[in-house]
A protein has these predicted regions:
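N-terminal, active-site-proximal structural segment of metallo-dependent hydrolase catalytic domains
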Residues: 19-110, 118-126, 195, 302-307, ...
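Metal-dependent phosphoester-hydrolase catalytic domains
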Residues: 20-21, 202-213, 221-335
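Structured beta-strand-rich core segments of catalytic domains in phosphoester-bond hydrolases
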Residues: 89, 95-172, 180
C-alpha cells in the first residue's frame, strides 16, 4: 500500500512540475502598417482607383494574392522566436476593408486570428483594424471614434481611433489603434490627433481604475516630436505620471539609431506602441518587459537605389513584390 502511495505521489509531482514548466509568463502585442492592402474591386465612394486592374499600379489578382501571402508571412512570424504563440493582438494600418482582412486570415498561418474593423471616413479607403488571437485575448467591447478635423481641415482628417477592450492573461487591457495624418499635413494636425487620443485615454482611465492601456499606431511622427509629447509619452519610466505613457521607442531611435522607415537616408520611428503607468510595475501583474523593431533581412531591400530601405510592394509604379515601407514593432509583456 505504501509503495502505491509513493508511486501516486511521484506521478502527481511530475504532473505539477510539467504544468509549472509550461505555464506562460511572457506575452506579446504588435503593430504593423501593411502599406496599401487593397483588393482589386472598387469600393463605392472611395478613391481606390490606383489599385484596380486598369489603375496606375495595374493591381490584379496575382499581385493581390502575393501581397496577402507576404503580409501573412510577416504577421505570423512576429515574436515567434520569443513567444511561441505569437502576438495576442496586432494593430494594423492601411487595410481597405473587411474583405481584405477576411482574405488575409484565410492564409493558413493566420487562421487562428480574428479581426475587428469598422469602415472609416478616409477618402482613399484605408482603415485601421485589430487582429487578435481569441485563445489569448478575450474581446469585451470595441468601437471606432471618429476624429474631429483640425480647424475645419477635412483633407488631412485622421482615420478614426479604434478602441478595443478585453482580457489578456486574466487582466483588463485596452488598446487604441491609430493612423495619424501623414507628413503632408503640418505638425499641428498630428498634435490635434494626439490631443484627441489623450482625451480618450483620460476618459478610459477615469472609468476603469488602474487600466492597463496600450496606444499603438503609425503616428507619422517620431517619439520626441510635439505630438507624442502632447499624448504624454515619456522617454524614461521614472518620468511617467498618472495618465501618461512610457515610450520605449524614444531610446530605440535616439540612442540606438534603429527605426521603422527610412526617408532620404534617415531612419524614422513612426510605428509606436506606448504603455500606461499600470503596465510599468516591477513585480505584480501584467507588465512591460522589452520592445523590438522586427527587422529581418527579407524585409530589407538588398541592392539598388534603395538598398537598406524596407522592401516595399512598389518602387514608384514598378511592382517589387515586397512587404511594406514600414517595419513592425513588438512589445513583450511579462506576467
Amino acid at each position: 500500500m505504501k509503495r502505491l502511495f509513493f508511486l501516486w505521489m511521484f506521478a502527481f509531482c511530475l504532473v505539477v512540475a510539467e504544468a509549472q514548466n509550461t505555464k506562460r509568463d511572457l506575452y506579446s502585442v504588435a503593430f504593423y502598417n501593411l502599406e496599401n492592402l487593397f483588393d482589386t474591386i472598387h469600393d463605392e465612394g472611395k478613391n481606390d482607383y490606383d489599385f484596380l486592374p486598369d489603375g496606375s499600379y495595374k493591381w490584379n489578382s496575382k499581385k493581390y494574392e502575393a501581397k496577402l501571402e507576404n503580409m501573412a508571412k510577416v504577421l505570423s512570424s512576429l515574436s515567434r522566436d520569443v513567444v511561441e504563440e505569437g502576438p495576442a493582438f496586432i494593430g494594423v494600418a492601411e487595410v481597405e476593408n473587411s474583405r481584405v482582412l477576411t482574405d488575409l486570415l484565410k492564409q493558413p498561418s493566420m487562421s487562428h486570428y480574428k479581426f475587428i474593423h469598422y469602415e472609416g471616413p478616409d477618402k482613399r479607403g484605408i482603415d485601421c483594424a485589430l487582429l487578435y488571437d481569441p485563445q489569448q485575448f478575450e474581446v469585451n467591447t470595441s468601437k471606432l471614434v471618429l476624429s474631429e478635423p483640425y480647424q475645419g481641415d477635412t483633407v488631412h482628417l485622421t482615420r478614426g481611433f479604434l478602441i478595443v477592450e478585453g482580457k489578456l492573461a486574466g487582466e483588463r487591457v485596452c488598446v487604441i489603434v491609430n493612423h495619424w495624418p501623414s507628413r503632408g499635413a503640418k505638425s499641428p494636425v498630428r498634435v490635434h490627433a494626439a490631443r484627441q487620443v489623450r482625451a480618450l485615454a483620460d476618459s478610459l482611465q477615469h472609468e476603469y481604475r488602474k487600466l492597463k492601456l496600450i496606444v499603438m499606431g503609425d503616428m507619422n511622427d517620431d517619439p520626441m516630436d510635439e505630438s507624442m509629447q502632447t499624448l504624454g509619452a515619456r522617454k524614461y519610466k521614472k518620468e511617467v505620471k498618472k495618465g501618461e505613457f512610457y515610450n520605449p521607442w524614444w531610446e530605440t531611435l535616439e540612442d540606438k539609431g534603429v527605426g521603422t522607415l527610412l526617408y532620404r537616408g534617415k531612419w524614422n520611428l513612426f510605428d509606436q506602441i506606448v504603455l500606461s503607468k499600470p503596465l510599468l510595475k516591477k513585480r505584480r501583474g501584467l507588465r512591460f518587459d522589452h520592445s523590438e523593431v522586427f527587422l529581418r533581412d527579407y524585409l530589407i531591400q538588398q541592392d539598388g537605389k534603395y538598398k537598406g530601405s524596407p522592401l516595399r510592394t512598389h518602387g514608384g509604379r514598378t511592382w517589387l513584390n515586397g512587404y511594406s515601407d514600414h517595419l513592425p514593432t513588438i512589445i513583450y509583456l511579462r506576467k
